[in-house]
Design a protein with these regions (language model features):
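Intrinsic-disorder/low-complexity, polar/charged segments enriched in Ser/Thr/Lys/Arg/Asp/Glu/Gln
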Residues: 44-48, 132-134
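Flexible ATP-lid and adjacent glycine-rich G1/G2 motifs of the Bergerat
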Residues: 46-109
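Short beta-strand/loop element within the Bergerat-fold HATPase_c
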Residues: 37-45
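N-terminal assembly/transducer modules of large multi-domain enzymes
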Residues: 2-36, 92-95, 99-271
Length: 271
């Protein structure tokens, strides 16, 4: 049985392997935090992502359909479908084991759409129903997975003494994270003139997980440092000293309150 998603071959044409894997991993992590244990395994050049006791409806193949809430990483409802498309388009076969069915996404010409190439999910009934939702992504080598894995902080955790954590998010102080922006543990972008790396607990992103505007970024930077400055003003001061054009410094000039200004003044006097 073929389930035609109606999604054209070139939809989200700038998505590739990273975006495809990201969507499956973020969905798995959301389910993990809801009590459905996630596992990640690389075996015979296949990345295998599983969640315990999960079955999703076929309606999940419709654009805009989502079971995720506001607090989840994937909010726009398109990740499953667009992730499939990106991976298959890039030459990575995908198999999904979902309850009593096996889904195999492919790109095919659709007669009902005048021969347009679209994403089709071929559905086959399994002999034995599975309780775990499992995604198998083919042609993922060790080097590729190592590079991708490093973009998920919940899979490749930073060293504790190289981080500062608050209710707003985490500052990543290791040089390897400089300029790296994460949201809920998933890499978003490498940003010029960031003196450190950051993992925010929440931030408005678009469908492609891009920062909506620079103002939001600067506001978040100020929020996280406001929450940390009393205990770690010396570290903030060192970060600001790295560059006179950093986003941290720009945000500070716009949003710093008197307490933050006083704490930094104390560090300046020490110097």
């Amino acid at each position: 049985m073929a389930l035609n998603t109606g999604i054209r071959y070139n939809y989200a044409s700038d998505w590739g392997v990273w975006e495809g894997v990201r969507e499956f991993v973020q969905n798995a992590q959301d389910a993990h935090e809801d009590g459905h244990k996630a596992t990640y395994e690389l075996k015979n050049n296949c990345l295998i992502i599983s969640n315990k006791n999960v079955v999703i409806p076929s309606a999940a193949l419709l654009l805009g359909y989502s079971v995720n809430g506001r607090s989840a990483r994937g909010r726009h409802g398109d990740g499953l479908k667009t992730g499939m498309l990106a991976l298959v388009r890039a030459g990575h076969a995908v198999e999904i084991y979902n309850g009593e069915n096996k889904w195999t996404p492919e790109i095919e010409a659709a007669e009902e759409y005048g021969g347009e190439r679209v994403l089709v999910v071929n559905q086959r009934k399994l002999r034995v129903t599975r309780t775990d939702f499992t995604v198998v992504i083919h042609n993922i080598g060790e080097g590729v997975w190592a590079a991708l894995r490093a973009r998920f902080l919940f899979l490749d955790k930073p060293i504790d003494f190289e981080t500062l954590t608050s209710s707003i998010g985490t500052v990543l102080l290791a040089p390897s994270y400089e300029g790296c922006l994460f949201v809920k543990g998933i890499f978003v972008a490498k940003i010029k003139d960031l003196a450190a790396g950051y993992d925010f607990n929440d931030m408005d992103l678009d469908r492609d997980r891009r920062v909506v505007d620079s103002w939001s970024l600067r506001y978040k930077l100020n929020e996280v440092w406001q929450s940390l400055v009393q205990q770690h003003g010396d570290i903030l001061y060192r970060q600001l000293r790295k560059s006179d054009s950093s986003h941290e410094l720009h945000g500070l000039s716009n949003y710093a309150d008197s307490g933050l200004a006083k704490r930094l003044q104390q560090e300046l006097i020490k110097e």
